[in-house]
Regions:
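Acidic, glycine/proline-rich Ca2+-coordinating loop motifs
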Residues: 1, 17-323
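Sec-dependent N-terminal signal peptides
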Residues: 3-13
């Protein structure tokens, strides 16, 4: 019998909180504006994290165009959008259209193709993260070619190039059916356009899955993947705006979903915006935080609760009102 021995040294020390400083200007990030979000990944596999900044495009202001920024590993980023192959779709004249963003019959003037969200995910399992862009009226899937360039495969992959009512503010990659390939859920902020789930077929194409019976049309802003009932199948939690209940889609072993937000105590009708997962209480259970126009919420499960319901700890831990 072989034995392995480990020496353990216990050290005591005083710990101080970390200090942060704004390096926007020194990192060449301060010039970009009208930004709707950022997606982080090591797209070129060089060991450091790169950025895709998704922006509301203004034809007469190049600083408002979406950008792919490569991390130079010295505290700076360089704009590689043009050489990446993504620029062909981003740096072009965008038409102004009248659009009912909120589904309330009031039309706003927007730029067709406004970038609203970005999400990295390796949909073809080649080790290189691919990029999905959620836009107004259209969306885009870019395949990472592994050499610093991308190819627009939106059409060939089975996604709508043009969708009349869509306003995709969130894109969530997850393997909902556990077949080893990332699927994608799209949160749509237009209540006249449903949220969508696309199943990855494993051959670089996707099929649209009907989830209309479990996810009603709403002003959905974002979505995260959690394990609400502690099985192996990921569930989907959706933040909805305008006093609508948030939605919790419980995965039915990869065969469909059932909406159960009220059952789990996470309906949270406070004008949902952002979502983030964490384990704030170190119980090895996935908790999540909801940022709202109204009060924020921090949900965690009671490990002794056989019903898997959640408790909102936001007031208890002082993250209820973050200003």
């Amino acid at each position: 019998m072989k034995y392995r021995f480990f020496s353990i040294f216990l050290l005591s020390q005083v710990l101080y909180s970390q200090q942060f400083r704004n390096i926007n200007n020194t990192s060449d990030l301060g010039v970009y504006n009208n930004n709707n979000g950022v997606a982080v990944a090591d797209y070129d596999k060089d060991g450091d994290l790169d950025l895709f900044i998704v922006s509301a495009h203004s034809n007469d202001n190049e600083d408002s165009w979406s950008r792919l920024l490569e991390n130079t590993n010295n505290g700076n980023f360089i704009d590689v959008t043009e050489n990446s192959g993504i620029s062909q779709s981003l740096d072009h004249e965008i038409n102004l259209i009248n659009y009912d963003i909120y589904g309330n019959q009031i039309y706003d003037v927007i730029e067709q193709g406004d970038r609203l969200s970005a999400s990295w995910g390796d949909f073809n399992n080649d080790g290189f993260p691919d990029l999905f862009l959620g836009n107004a009226v259209q969306s885009e899937l870019y395949k990472n070619n592994g050499n610093g360039t991308f190819s627009n495969v939106t059409d060939s992959a089975g996604f709508e190039i043009y969708c009349e009512n869509c306003y995709i503010t969130g894109a969530l990659w997850l393997d909902y059916d556990l077949d080893g390939y990332l699927d994608i859920f799209l949160a749509d902020y237009n209540s006249n356009s449903p949220n969508k789930l696309y199943r990855n077929l494993g051959n670089e194409t996707f099929e649209l899955i009907d989830i209309s019976s479990s996810s009603e049309n709403a002003n959905s802003f974002s979505a995260i993947s959690i394990y609400a009932n502690d099985d192996m199948y990921p569930d989907i939690y959706i933040a909805n705006d305008f006093d609508l209940n948030n939605q919790l889609l419980i995965n039915q072993n990869g065969e469909g979903f059932i909406e159960m937000a009220v059952d789990f105590g996470v309906e949270d009708p406070y004008d949902g915006m952002g979502l983030a997962t964490c384990d704030f209480n170190n119980d090895l259970k996935l908790d999540f935080y909801v940022t709202n126009i109204k009060e924020n919420s921090l949900y965690a499960k009671d490990i002794f609760d056989a019903e898997f319901t959640y408790t909102n700890y936001s007031e208890q831990v002082n993250v209820y009102d973050t200003g």
